[in-house]
Amino acid sequence: MASGTHAHEKYWPVIEAFFDYYGLVGQHLDSFNRFVREELQQVVDSVGKLTPKIEGYVVELGDIEIGKPTIREADGSEHDLTPNEARIRNLTYASKLFLNMTPVRKEGSVSTRLETLKVYIGNMPIMLRSEKCHLHGKSDDDLIRMGDDPKDHGGYFIINGSERV
């Protein structure tokens, strides 16, 4: 039994190197980034177009756009929303989702594409330290200045001010 234990010791450097590189949340961040960067658009592309109840029209679905979290204040001003502010103010750390939509009018065999519209379709919670997070790529000094812990690797969401996995 003791020799079996020693045989496994040679694997620990590989395991430690994996966690040093990815951390405990690396897979969560990679998965979320892939979802935002590729898979969300693939869902839109698979739908392709909508047929409204208005005869002679279809709506072609285009690119989806996701920015970094912002907040609009009561006075109408808008600014970047940081995770720390979301926690303190009991807000959801989320980004606005926009979808480019092009109405197409069909009259007989003639189709006329109208002006493409950038349409707000909702908000999406943003995973902390993902590519869409304001903390992504920041130095330790910047993180401290923003009110966040440099040792916090992210991989979770802030919903109504509470951290959720």
Q: Where are the model-predicted features located?
A:
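Conserved N-terminal architectural modules of multi-subunit, DNA-dependent RNA polymerase core subunits
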Residues: M1-V165
